[in-house]
From Swiss-Prot:
Protein's organism: Rattus norvegicus (Rat)
Signal peptide, first to last residue: 1-15
Essential cofactor(s): Ca(2+); chloride
Protein name: Pancreatic alpha-amylase
Pfam families: Alpha-amylase, Alpha-amylase_C
Localisation per UniProt entry: Secreted, Extracellular space
Length: 508
């Protein structure tokens, strides 16, 4: 009995790090600004059959409507109430999505904006996505309700301007956003009520927006009020998966490690460093990736949520700077995402974006505010083209063959060790995941031609980067692995996709 009790305690303590994905699924996708109706369809027609574990959705709560500039993406990070009512859909549409996605084994993770309400400079009125009245000037949010007492103005009535002062970062206003007093039990209860409504509907967990701007103890107090996950889809006693947005590139007062007790943290160094390596900036080479992960000063693998780019830094916001790779850099981007999905470090998130017209002035994209594809503010449907790509300016990187097939690769090699590393001292590298998968990259300016130890059983394999295994045949390159586990690889430096990946399920 003691042993069982101990196990259940350990299970309880560790639950917030577990994404609760179905049957060995190892990656989630951020369907940024998608409508709930489109996500429900995508779970059924694509994400479930292709092995995706879950979806991070945009903030579902009521937000301010900003008309200057016209309906920017960032208006969704300015809450007005906790009603589920946004340009992605209403509460019934949200419930339908969660039910349909869970029913096919795809989890939903909500982007929870709980540090603040809208910006202090906005005018009073009902210009919100559900028409709720608010008055930022006197801190009135009647649909919650919050009043001035529930904000941090008595601790700090100005902006954050010194990131070496932890008190300022956590008590002052982030970009003018009214900072909630999460040390007050009333505020904690209102936030927990919102999150519990979502948990009861069936979500599996939360991204905590702006976690660095909240005290870890205040976050814990909110998490302690949360319900267990809905037993219709999750085992009894399951706790919500938590990943906290903590931008810690080093050199500031606040460290990501302060948040480990609450859940995982977003490792922003990951995409920034990987981008620098793939771009070959600052003398970086892929051969240096041999000790990728903790060896590069990242948080421990079981505390990391990793990504190549996110909705902020793909448009120059947040963290990472110019090295961040995005869909605009398609060739390098596919290599970076391929490396991430092949490497065992961290829990992985794939980005799915929308296109906009960029306009660089003095190195800054002055169009970085533009919201999702829309008709007069109504978000456009995600249409699917005959070639399985998306229309209406939705990029759908998660549907690119090279990325979708590497999500499957990660599932196949799950739990296998990082092994059989090879490099040429420059930008040609390869490694296996035990005896289940092997990947090789050529990011040099000359051809790769080498016989390498794959660690895989003998046979003919289909390269899942150049093609697919269909009815026992391969639409791309074939790789022959000998009885000694070795195979010959040739990759031109001018190849559209200068990498090859094979795995147990791609064996012909």
């Amino acid at each position: 009995m003691k042993f069982v009790l101990l196990l259940s305690l350990i299970g309880f303590c560790w639950a917030q790090y577990d994404p609760h994905t179905a049957d060995g699924r190892t990656a989630i996708v951020h369907l940024f600004e998608w409508r709930w109706a489109d996500i429900a369809k995508e779970c059924e027609r694509y994400l479930a059959p292709k092995g995706f574990g879950g979806v991070q959705v945009s903030p579902p709560n009521e937000n301010i409507i900003i008309n200057n500039p016209s309906r920017p993406w960032w208006e969704r990070y300015q809450p007005i109430s906790y009603k589920i009512c946004s340009r992605s859909g209403n509460e019934n549409e949200f419930k339908d999505m969660v039910t349909r996605c869970n029913n096919v084994g795809v989890r939903i993770y909500v982007d929870a904006v709980i540090n603040h309400m809208c910006g202090s400079g906005n005018s009073a009125g009902t210009h919100s996505t559900c028409g709720s009245y608010f008055n930022p000037n006197n801190r009135e949010f009647s649909a919650v309700p919050y009043s001035a007492w529930y904000f941090n103005d008595n601790k700090c009535n100005g902006e954050i301007n010194n990131y070496n002062d932890a008190n300022q970062v956590r008590n002052c206003r982030l970009s003018g956003l009214l900072d909630l007093a999460l040390d007050k039990d009333y505020v904690r209860t209102k936030v927990a009520d919102y999150m519990n409504n979502l948990i009861d509907i069936g979500v599996a967990g939360f991204r905590l927006d702006a976690a660095k701007h909240m005290w870890p103890g205040d976050i814990k107090a909110v998490l302690d009020k949360l319900h267990n996950l809905n037993t219709k889809w999750f085992s009894q006693g399951s706790r919500p998966f938590i990943f906290q947005e903590v931008i810690d590139l080093g050199g500031e007062a606040i460290k990501g490690s302060e948040y480990f007790g609450n859940g995982r943290v977003t490792e922003f160094k990951y995409g920034a460093k990987l981008g620098t390596v793939i771009r070959k900036w600052n003398g970086e080479k892929m051969s240096y990736l041999k000790n990728w992960g903790e060896g590069w000063g990242f948080v421990p693998t079981d505390r990391a949520l990793v990504f190549v780019d996110n909705h902020d830094n793909q448009r120059g916001h947040g963290a990472g700077g110019a090295s961040i790779l995005t869909f605009w850099d398609a060739r390098m981007y596919k290599m970076a995402v391929g490396f991430m999905l092949a490497h065992p470090y961290g829990f992985t998130r794939v980005m799915s974006s929308y296109r906009r017209t960029r306009n660089f002035q003095n190195g800054k994209d002055v169009n970085d505010w533009i919201g999702p594809p829309n008709n007069n503010g109504v978000t456009k449907e995600v249409t699917i083209n005959p070639d399985t790509t998306c229309g209406n300016d939705w990029v759908c990187e998660h549907r690119w063959r090279q990325i979708r097939n590497m999500v499957a690769f990660r599932n196949v090699v799950n739990g296998q060790p990082f092994a059989n590393w090879w490099d040429n001292g420059s930008n040609q590298v390869a490694f296996s995941r035990g005896n289940r998968g092997f990947i090789v990259f050529n990011n040099d300016d000359w051809a790769l031609s080498s016989t390498l130890q794959t660690g895989l059983p003998a046979g003919t394999y289909c390269d899942v980067i150049s093609g697919d295994k269909v009815n026992g045949n391969c639409t791309g390159l074939k790789v022959n692995v000998g009885s000694d586990g070795k195979a010959h690889f040739s990759i031109s430096n001018s190849a559209e996709d200068p990498f090859i990946a094979i795995h147990a399920d791609s064996k012909l």
